[in-house]
Amino acid sequence: MKPGDLVIARAAKVKRRNPPNAIMLYDWKTTGYLPWKNGNLGMIIELDPKTEGAIVMADGNVGWVSQVIIEVIDESG
């Protein structure tokens, strides 16, 4: 996983009783959350090793998301 990689949101990997129908990107500017639908593509802008998260651009939004709920798209076919 590195900046520039295309990733897909995987809500199923979140260990919750009622997984949300959207991944929430944390917007540090407004301290709010932006929706990112399960299965939609995004691109890693920067990795954040301290929090085990990534800054991702997805669905027209940019925010932080846990690396646990994203999966790199294998472009090799």
Predicted segments — roles?
Residues K2-G77:
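Basic/aromatic-rich interaction segments and small domains that mediate binding to polyanionic partners
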